[in-house]
């Protein structure tokens, strides 16, 4: 879900280096228009308060105006994710999005997708509240974090024997662990920075921190 939907798609198609390059080189200007920067800063301030209710009115206002433009994010997906390659990869891929305004979850894996709608599924799962909803079929979808920001239980339902969950301590709904023996979690040792601020220097710091946090976990 959220940015994890994009990370996971790149990893599932075998492009770990491309995923790292994305984080080490991408800034807000590469993904968002000048007109949307003010609203992004509002999101950063309110998500940092860790309150879903604080976002409600601004999300409503953004969506009434069409939502934050996601065309640059879609362009990145089109340039970097090969639908056929992803679907044929031996690594499975799953995502969650939430239908808007019904707030009903869509949980899908590669077996549920086609080459024509793979990118729609990835973008839908990454469409943070306040972004333009992504259309799949006859429904509009937003970030799956509105339903489950760390879907370890869904992976157990899907048949995984063990789940290693990378936690971000950020936006979204977190459900209780269903099986503590099968689910292990890695938490960041320090704050990661604002959720909607893409900055190469911060990203490189977080990648290094994630490496050491994982090594301690192992």
Predicted feature locations:
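Patatin-like phospholipase
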Residues: 1, 9-218
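Gly/Ala-rich beta-loop-alpha elbow adjacent to hydrolase catalytic centers
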Residues: 4
């Amino acid at each position: 879900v959220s940015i994890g939907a994009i990370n996971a798609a790149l990893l599932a198609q075998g492009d770990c280096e491309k995923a790292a390059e994305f984080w080490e080189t991408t800034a807000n200007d590469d993904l968002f228009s000048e007109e949307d920067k003010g609203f992004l800063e509002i999101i950063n301030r309110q998500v940092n308060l860790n309150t879903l209710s604080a976002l409600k009115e601004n999300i409503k206002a953004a969506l009434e105006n069409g939502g934050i433009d996601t065309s640059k994010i879609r362009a990145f997906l089109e340039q970097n994710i090969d639908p056929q390659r992803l679907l044929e990869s031996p690594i499975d891929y799953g995502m969650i999005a939430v239908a808007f305004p019904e707030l009903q979850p869509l949980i899908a894996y590669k077996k549920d997708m086609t080459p024509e709608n793979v990118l729609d599924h990835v973008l839908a799962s990454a469409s943070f509240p306040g972004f333009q909803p992504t259309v799949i079929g006859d429904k509009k979808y937003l970030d799956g974090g509105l339903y489950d920001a760390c879907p370890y239980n869904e992976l157990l339902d899907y048949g995984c024997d063990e789940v290693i969950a990378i936690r971000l301590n950020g936006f979204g709904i977190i459900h209780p662990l269903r099986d503590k023996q099968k689910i292990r979690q890695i938490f960041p040792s320090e704050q990661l920075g604002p959720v909607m601020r893409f900055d190469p220097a911060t990203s490189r710091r977080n990648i290094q921190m994630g490496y050491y946090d994982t090594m301690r976990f192992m």
